[in-house]
């Protein structure tokens, strides 16, 4: 009897945990299209600044976001769980979902109406996904489908990377490979001879400092949009070079 009660209690706790997880999953309706070709080669670059998605670690499951989701770059790096809404179209691959990373911006097309080509016009919530990601959930020939989406933790391999471009008194730091929330809300840099200095978002996931940091070992602090903070000490050595990328040994949990 005692063993049966323990089994019942265990199952009850599992169910309660699952229900809490489902309740916490904030599903929102949107639409989705695709671009970039079957190998996603057409998705390289993008307004988040990641460049080559393969070498940046984002692979082919990426998406451009409409203005309503993009937030002037604030959503760069965020991960979304997307599923085709089978209750609203026959073009879904039932029972499937895909996790995509926001890497680009889908601009509005005001010459077209929102339901006839202007998919990314405000206030529409729209995902213009890579073709491989799209075909994980929908039939190729459908063109556009209704979807449901939710933010989901990003899983990354290794630490956060910091690519340094610019010149003296103008450091432009590209922050990539961010796990957890994935989206950076604030960033700081510290030279071995300075205090912590706040950086500002220049564009996408490029963060700007106007300090003179040449010849100093650099540490970085990153705050995600969920409030989490990680600090990467002495990521770049004192002889760091513009045009180089430095990988830390820290990242957010997921």
From Swiss-Prot:
GO terms for biological process: plant-type cell wall loosening. Pfam families: DPBB_1 (PF03330), Expansin_C (PF01357). It is a peripheral membrane protein. Glycans are attached at residues 61, 94, 109, 251. Residues 1-21 form the signal peptide. Keywords: Cell wall, Cell wall biogenesis/degradation, Disulfide bond, Glycoprotein, Membrane, Secreted, Signal. Residues 169-248 form the Expansin-like CBD domain. The keyword Secreted applies. It comes from the Eukaryota. It is found in: Secreted, Cell wall; Membrane. Residues 45-159 form the Expansin-like EG45 domain. SMART domains: DPBB_1. Expressed in roots. Disulfide bonds join 48-76, 79-154, 84-92. The keyword Secreted applies. InterPro entries: Expan_Lol_pI (IPR007118), Expansin (IPR002963), Expansin/allergen_DPBB_dom (IPR007112), Expansin_CBD (IPR007117), Expansin_CBD_sf (IPR036749), RlpA-like_DPBB (IPR009009), RlpA-like_sf (IPR036908). GO terms for cellular component: extracellular region; membrane. May cause loosening and extension of plant cell walls by disrupting non-covalent bonding between cellulose microfibrils and matrix glucans. No enzymatic activity has been found. May be required for rapid internodal elongation in deepwater rice during submergence. Belongs to the expansin family. Expansin A subfamily. PANTHER family: EXPANSIN-A15 (PTHR31867). This is Expansin-A9. It comes from Oryza sativa subsp. japonica.
């Amino acid at each position: 009897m005692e063993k049966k009660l323990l089994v019942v209690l265990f199952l009850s706790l599992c169910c309660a945990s699952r229900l809490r997880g489902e309740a916490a999953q904030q599903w929102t309706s949107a639409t989705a299209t695709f671009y970039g070709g079957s190998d996603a080669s057409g998705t390289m670059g993008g307004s988040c600044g990641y460049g080559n998605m393969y070498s940046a670690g984002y692979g082919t499951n990426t998406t451009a976001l409409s203005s309503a989701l993009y937030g002037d770059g604030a959503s760069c790096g965020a991960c979304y769980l997307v599923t085709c809404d089978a209750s609203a179209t026959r073009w879904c691959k039932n029972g499937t979902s895909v996790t995509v990373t926001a890497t680009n911006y889908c601009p509005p097309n005001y010459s077209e109406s929102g339901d006839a080509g202007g998919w990314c016009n405000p206030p529409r919530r729209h995902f213009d996904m890579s073709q491989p990601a799209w075909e994980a959930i929908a039939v190729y020939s459908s063109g556009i489908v209704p979807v449901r989406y939710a933010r989901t933790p990003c899983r990354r391999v290794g630490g956060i990377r910091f690519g340094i471009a610019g010149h003296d008194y103008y450091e432009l730091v590209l922050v990539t490979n961010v796990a957890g929330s994935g989206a950076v809300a604030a960033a700081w840099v510290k030279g071995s001879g300075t205090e912590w200095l706040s950086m500002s978002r220049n564009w996408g996931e490029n963060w700007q400092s106007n300090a003179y940091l040449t010849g100093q070992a650099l540490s970085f602090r990153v705050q995600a949009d969920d409030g989490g903070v990680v600090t990467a000490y002495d990521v770049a050595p004192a002889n760091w070079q513009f045009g180089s990328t430095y990988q830390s040994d820290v990242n957010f949990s997921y």
